[in-house]
A protein has these predicted regions:
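Acidic/histidine-rich alpha-helical segments that form the ligand environment
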Residues: 75-108, 123-132
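A short, ordered amphipathic alpha-helix with a cationic face
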Residues: 17-19, 111
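Extreme N-terminal tail/first-helix region
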Residues: 1-15
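Short, contiguous alpha-helical
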Residues: 7-11, 28-71, 112-150
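Charged, amphipathic alpha-helical oligomerization/scaffolding segments
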Residues: 12, 16, 47, 86-89, ...
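Charged/polar positions within long, soluble alpha-helices
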Residues: 19-22, 26, 53, 57-60, ...
Length: 150
């Protein structure tokens, strides 16, 4: 997959993530869990921010980002404005990082072993884009299901 295509996918879905967080009518519902829904929209948002900043920003872009995965799922009641700023900052990191790459870099081995074996940078970036889309769908469903007046 080309760098431009990857940038387009990340831009599209991080923009949709921002829209989903903005679309909660009741900001407190961003953090609601219910029955078998164990992850709130807010925690999934924090998870995506952490995941992308770690695997793209820190590992490829050499940013100083330090991931705290446990906090992504335990932190609560982060203001919507902070989540939105973090999403915007994450998109900037993705674009800055991908802009430093040449197409040939996509065929190099990704710097970390993530799934117990080596993989190309291209493969892992596609994985990260599909991981983003997967959780984006969960957040959309969370919002439509739980952001209702009762």
């Amino acid at each position: 997959m080309s760098i431009k295509t990857l940038q387009s996918l990340f831009e599209r879905d991080l923009t949709k993530l921002k829209l989903e967080i903005e679309s909660y009518q009741d900001e407190s519902k961003i953090w609601v869990i219910d029955k078998n829904i164990l992850n709130s929209g807010g925690n999934l948002c924090l998870h995506l921010i952490g995941n992308i900043n770690h695997f793209i920003g820190a590992q490829i872009g050499k940013t100083d980002y330090i991931r705290n995965r446990e906090l992504e799922f335990s932190q609560k009641d982060v203001p919507r404005t902070v989540l939105i700023q973090k999403i915007e900052d994450t998109l900037a990191v993705v674009n800055q990082t991908l802009n430093t790459l040449e197409e040939a870099d996509l065929e190099t081995i990704y710097p970390l072993i993530v799934f117990e074996k080596e993989m190309t940078t291209d493969f892992f970036l596609v994985h990260l884009a599909t991981h983003l889309a997967y959780h984006l769908g969960q957040i959309n469903y969370h919002r439509r299901l739980l952001d209702t007046a009762k």
